[in-house]
Every structure is written in structure tokens, then in C-alpha cells.
Amino acid sequence: TPEKVGRLMHAIYNYQGSLVVRSALQIMALTFCRTTEIRCAEWQEFDFEDNIWRIPAERMKMRRDHLVPLSRQALAVLEKLRAYSGGNQYVFPSYRSETIPFGRTALQRAIRRMGFEKDEMCPHGFRAMASTLLNELGYNRDWIERQLAHAPTEQIRGIYNRAEYLSERRRMLQNWADYLDGLRAKARQEVDLE
């Protein structure tokens, strides 16, 4: 529900653990990229003039380059992180070594530490959450599926439709980020009233 999403976003933005893990969770919520795409993100993949993240095919499940538009909120998270890890290869380095990405279980552990059980939220759940809410909000299914980097379900459609829907996805992701901010603000008010 939107209320649960608001509580989740409030918990993420107030997470007292590592800056890298908090930032990774924020980017995951804002872009709904897969855990490995986030963990192994490299600074060279980001174009801050075009506000786009170009994930190379070899890092994608479908083995196809993926363009991820970056909202103002995602850019703000990345700017904060750039002061911390900008000189490294990885955007989200391990606290043990700057030359490797953070651990595979770090996001899961952080979500548990914030009080969310396995049946409530897991890292992959950000993708389902975004898809569900964006569909309920009336966004075009093709835009959502392209943002999720899913292969089209109809084989013929997949062969012929190679559209990126970049300007539409850019608008959708900015609206999504604003929507999440609104849900988080509402959750913060509820916490303040308790």
C-alpha cells in the first residue's frame, strides 16, 4: 500500500547505517534496478550532463544495454555519494575495500535492521512495488516494463518493439520520485504525531 511505501521510504532516508547502503537503497527505490546492477554500478556509467545511467549489456540480465533516466532526487543521492566514493571505480564500494562493491547481503540486512520482515520487503521487492504502484497510477505498461529492463512477453512484439521510451520514462521517473517524496513526508508526519 502507499502507506507502507511511505513508511519504508521514511525508514530508508533515516537509516543510521552506512552511507553507501542507505544511498543504494534510495537509488534502488528511485530507479527499480536489480540488486546486482546497483551493487556493481561504476562511476563511468553515469552521464551527469544527460542525467542518465548507461548500464552495459554485460551487466544486464537480458544482455542488452539499459538506459536509466535519473530524477532530481537520484542525482542528489549520487552527488552526496560522489564526495565519498567519486574517486573509486564503484559507486557503492565495500567498507572493507574501495576496489570491490559492497556485499551481496548488505541491503537485505539493512532492510531487516529497519524493522521490515522478509514477507514485507526484500531488495527485489522495490521492483514489484514500483511496477504495481505505477500500473495503479495509470502509467503505460511498456514504459514500466522497459524501465524494469524486462523482455516483452509476446515474442513478436519483442522482435519489433525496440523503443526505449526515454523521454516518457524520464517524466515517469521524476513523477515517481516526487510521489515517493510525498509518501515519505506523510509517513514522517505520522511518526511525528506518535
Model-derived segments and spans:
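Basic, Lys/Arg- and aromatic-enriched nucleic-acid-binding interface segment
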Residues: 1-41, 49, 60-64, 84-85, ...
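Active-site/catalytic core of tyrosine-dependent DNA strand-transfer enzymes
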Residues: 1-6, 50, 69-119, 129, ...
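Short, contiguous acidic/charged loop-to-helix segments that flank catalytic cores in large enzymes
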Residues: 12-16, 57-67, 93-99, 117-125, ...
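C-terminal catalytic core of tyrosine-transesterase DNA break-rejoin enzymes
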Residues: 26-37, 125-151
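Conserved tyrosine-mediated DNA breakage-rejoining catalytic core shared by Y-recombinases
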Residues: 31, 36, 40-83, 151-158
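Residues in the recognition helix of alpha-helical DNA-binding motifs
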Residues: 41, 110, 147
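Short, polar N-cap/turn motifs at the start of nucleic acid-interacting alpha helices
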Residues: 45-52, 118-120, 137-161, 182-188
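C-terminal secondary-structure termini that scaffold catalytic or DNA-interacting sites
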Residues: 61, 72-76, 80-88, 93-99, ...
